[in-house]
């Protein structure tokens, strides 16, 4: 299959450290969501908590998904001063993190 054209999804799976309060987590999520207003290449942001009954989460409790127009836009986002500043605070609050960038691909049958 050839690489899909179109947007890139930047997905971050996270588990917060035990000492991070629910209020602090809410503040961090709002800060993450606000990056879409500060960094032009970031087109959309969604997040959620694990609700699976399969118990395959490997300790990850939260998922964050950002949408970009290209891989180059993701690189621009990562280097942006607002992201660098936020990431320092955000990552310092996490026990575990996993990041994957992918292009949504449809399968023709």
UniProtKB/Swiss-Prot annotation:
Residues 8-102 form the Stress-response A/B barrel domain. Pfam families: Dabb (PF07876). GO terms for cellular component: cytosol; plasma membrane. Mg(2+) binds at residues 36, 39-40, 42. Keywords: Magnesium, Metal-binding, Plant defense. Induction: By salicylic acid (SA) and jasmonic acid (JA). SMART domains: Dabb (SM00886). It comes from the Eukaryota. One of its GO terms (molecular function) is metal ion binding. The keyword Ribosomal protein does not apply. Its cofactor is Mg(2+). Homodimer. Heat stable protein involved in defense against fungal pathogens. Possesses antifungal activity against diverse pathogenic fungi. Possesses antimicrobial activity. Possesses ribonuclease activity. This is Stress-response A/B barrel domain-containing protein HS1. It comes from Arabidopsis thaliana (Mouse-ear cress). The gene is HS1.
């Amino acid at each position: 299959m050839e690489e899909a054209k179109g947007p890139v999804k930047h997905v971050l799976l996270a588990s917060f450290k035990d000492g991070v309060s629910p209020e602090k987590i809410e503040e961090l999520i709002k800060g993450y969501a606000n990056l879409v207003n500060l960094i032009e290449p970031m087109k959309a942001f969604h997040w959620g908590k694990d609700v699976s009954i399969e118990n395959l989460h490997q300790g990850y409790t939260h998922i964050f998904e950002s949408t970009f127009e290209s891989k180059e836009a993701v690189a621009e986002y990562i280097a942006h001063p607002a992201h660098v500043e936020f990431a320092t605070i955000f990552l310092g609050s996490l026990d575990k993190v996993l990041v994957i960038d992918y292009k949504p691909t449809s399968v023709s049958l």
